[in-house]
Amino acid sequence: MIYLPDGVQDFLPEEYKFKRKIEEKFREVFIKFGYQEIMPPTFEYNDNFSVLFDENNLYRFFDKKGNILALRPDVTTQIARIVSTKLKGSFPLKLCYVANVYRYDDPQVGKMREFTQAGIELIGTNHEESDAEIIAVAIEALKSIGIEDFKVDVGQVEFFKRVVEDLELQNEEINLLREFLQQKNQSAIEEFINDKGIRGKKAKFLSELPLLFGGEEVLKRAKELYDTPKLGETIDYLERVYRILKDFGMEEYISFDLGMVQNLNYYTGIIFRCFVKGIGYAICTGGRYDGLLGIFGEHIPATGFAISVERSMLALQKQKKDIIDKSWRVLIKYKENLRSNAYKKATLLRGEGKIVEMYSYEKAKHVDENSFDEIIDMEE
């Protein structure tokens, strides 16, 4: 038996047609918002990625010179490098991509070790209009492929960061608390509070942080729980972003989750995830990463998102949506002496956007005629 490695898959013709259509629709939305497509290399020097990603999650290999290379685990990091080294100058800069990425993680539903991301990066701005635009483009992209009943959960890394700073936690404790918040494990958080002897407002805020999700009333509740100037500014910023999205008519898609934490460490501000009703995993993640370009020598603010194409496919399949345009299929059967005429006819029909296959009568005996919408006989 011949097997594939864990975490990769074949896309058969109909599946791949479905996947390509989704990618095309995402790309079309991005371009209409002014984003220019870019394509970084599939692999780079390992050091370009290991500064942000655990090397155990990278696909690494040596070239013939002994250099350690790695398949890209993320496109945003590559774009940060490109902007810092090759696109310095006029900002804001709008870039988009559709590309495969590679992570040696445990395979999940709709997320293999090789998977496709479609995303945008808005570089050189650090105001609420840019964060609102990023979220708006994500919403428009999902709508463009016909996904319904989805929500964009909006958070801010400042909430988790503030808790960690105030409690002076060690790295191991930070990772443990991050895991509890991701799982919204209330009992584990309560146990954590008791074990660490956390008291007063800090204990109250940490206890309620995983519960701070819902509509804009969540922001008011957060201010009441932990009224500090820094968090007050953070909440005010979220309110301004929300007002812009309301002006765009997108409030029905927005909810807040102030206990949200992201796995990627480069996020510095607003973060968000898109969930489809009935599907328990995010199909899109994004946020602000003002410090990432600094790793490559340029301190430039930026924000963006990535949509999982495979998870978008699963969401559409679950909602029983078919976005493939049904092309008219034509079979031309011809006598050997009429091959030239048959080819001219096929060329004419292909120019009209039809799919045309042509076979001599002898070869056509083995063709499934039921798979065609039209059959043309060229006998004379």
Swiss-Prot record:
GO molecular function: catalytic activity, acting on a protein; histidine-tRNA ligase activity; transferase activity
Keywords, alphabetical: Amino-acid biosynthesis, Cytoplasm, Histidine biosynthesis
Domain of life according to the entry: Bacteria
SUPFAM superfamilies assigned: Class II aaRS and biotin synthetases
Subcellular location: Cytoplasm
InterPro entries: aa-tRNA-synth_II, aa-tRNA-synth_II/BPL/LPL, HisRS-like_core, HisRS/HisZ, HisZ
Known pathway: Amino-acid biosynthesis; L-histidine biosynthesis; L-histidine from 5-phospho-alpha-D-ribose 1-diphosphate: step 1/9
Gene3D superfamilies from the UniProt entry: Bira Bifunctional Protein, Domain 2 (3.30.930.10)
A single BP term in Gene Ontology: L-histidine biosynthetic process
Keyword Amino-acid biosynthesis: yes
PROSITE patterns the UniProt entry points to: AA_TRNA_LIGASE_II (PS50862)
GO CC term, one of those recorded: cytoplasm
Remaining remarks: This function is generally fulfilled by the C-terminal part of HisG, which is missing in some bacteria such as this one.
Protein family per UniProt: Belongs to the class-II aminoacyl-tRNA synthetase family. HisZ subfamily.
Function statement: Required for the first step of histidine biosynthesis. May allow the feedback regulation of ATP phosphoribosyltransferase activity by histidine.
Binding partners and assembly: Heteromultimer composed of HisG and HisZ subunits.
Name of the protein: ATP phosphoribosyltransferase regulatory subunit
Natural source organism: Thermoanaerobacter sp. (strain X514)
Gene: hisZ
